[in-house]
Amino acid sequence: MKDLCAIYTAAGVNYIDVAAEVSIVRAAKKGIEWAKKVFKNSPGLMISISDGDDIHFRKAKFDPLRCPPNCPRPCEKVCPTSAIDNSGIKENKCYGCGRCLNSCPLNLISDYEYNLSKDDLASTLQKIKPDAVEIHTDIDRIDSFKKVVNTLKNSEIKLKNISTSCGLNQKVQKSHEPEDLLKAIWERYEILNELKIPLIWQLDGRPMSGDLAPATGRNTVNLFEKIGSDLPPGLIQLAGGTNEKTHEFLNSKNLPDGIAFGSAARKIMQPL
């Protein structure tokens, strides 16, 4: 984590988004501070939180006692954070990318939901003091979104930005139209606007798919082209399957303010 954040800082990114865990943030800050001294770049540190069940907030697990002694351990090889060893999966290193789930030849690895409680969120904010927060939400979760925003407000942490991440069809059992997403984003704007903090709207095309193929950015580009011009005031960021090829699908006369590329960047630094 420290090395990755140092490299991202050297590359000149605007924000580095990490899990809302003290140990991870501590490592990220060390990497950022080292690179700042050398390259003079100074990205903001953003933490991700959620207002409910979210595929971005999962971790992997398995019982190491069930592993055969002669296993080639493909799970270790595909893990981008080196969270897996002979003792199992280190919870504080796993960020839920899901790569290991299909790597096990015996299907011993499963995932579970992991999220901060309301009380944990308040104390974590005080410990971490991030520059920005990204709230992962769902079209149908307006009440829980209000509660998270209220926690942010009461924390009195001085944030430079608040990002809201939402997309279509994040739940398999229920699909939505772009108009539904646009309505949901405007509802969240009305809630966030009173905080007087600059906003970022993240359009999630393929939420935490783990798919790194070049064309995976088409979904978020299509979503941006449909509703981008009608979004509330704030910066627009594309995410979910985005990578170094995503900009090729964009119209040069209609560009977003930014593109997230976490999985693609990790692939370059830590090839599978």
Go through each PLM region and give its residues.
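Ferredoxin-type iron-sulfur electron-transfer modules and their immediate structural context
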Residues: 1-83
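Short, well-ordered strand-loop elements centered on a beta-strand within folded domains, enriched
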Residues: 45, 89-90, 236
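A composition-driven signal for long, intrinsically disordered, charge-rich low-complexity tracts
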Residues: 73, 92, 200-202
